[in-house]
């Protein structure tokens, strides 16, 4: 009797599963109370500042790293680095810095959207969700993994895009 292999749950799946308790919890907290609302805003601001500081520190580590003159073949398009036309490469330092800047841009745009939704229309759920998802987005930035956690061997460049739904990836196994 051979046991059927159960497919591994993709790493991003917990983010999708965490949404339901967050939405349920947001209905249980009285955000009409000024203290609760200000506490949520403070937590949101702290998450944004810590996420931005982590990305900025990673960017400093990228610029100070040795071996940045090595080349990455076929890095894909980005507004944050220039590819050499003759051999379709970019330096490792420029590539890693570009990936950190892309994540930083996503952070900034997300914060802008959340602030508009909250301060213009009064929604609080997006702030709660952002407090959960933003640190996981920073954690998933491969440049953060390589330069802050030393996971160089686990993430050979060019890095694959993380796009797609984790539920879809899990269902295809």
Locations of regions flagged by a protein language model:
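Transmembrane alpha-helices of multi-pass eukaryotic membrane proteins
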Residues: 10-20, 36-48, 102-106, 110
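Short membrane-interface loop/juxtamembrane segments of multi-pass integral membrane proteins
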Residues: 73-100
């Amino acid at each position: 009797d051979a046991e059927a292999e159960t497919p591994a749950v993709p790493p991003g799946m917990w983010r999708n599963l965490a949404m339901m308790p967050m939405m349920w919890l947001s209905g249980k907290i009285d955000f009409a109370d000024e203290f609760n609302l200000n506490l949520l805003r403070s937590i949101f601001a702290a998450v944004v500042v810590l996420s931005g500081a982590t990305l900025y520190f990673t960017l400093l580590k990228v610029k100070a790293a040795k071996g940045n003159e090595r080349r990455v073949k076929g890095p894909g398009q980005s507004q944050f680095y220039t590819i050499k036309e003759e051999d379709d490469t970019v330096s490792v330092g420029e590539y890693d810095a570009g990936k950190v800047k892309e994540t930083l841009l996503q952070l900034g745009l997300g914060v802008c959207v959340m602030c508009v939704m909250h301060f213009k229309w009064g929604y609080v759920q997006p702030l709660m969700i952002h407090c959960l998802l933003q640190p996981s987005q920073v954690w998933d930035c491969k440049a953060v993994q390589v330069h802050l956690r030393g996971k160089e061997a686990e993430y050979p460049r060019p890095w694959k895009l993380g796009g797609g739904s984790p539920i879809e990836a899990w269902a295809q196994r």
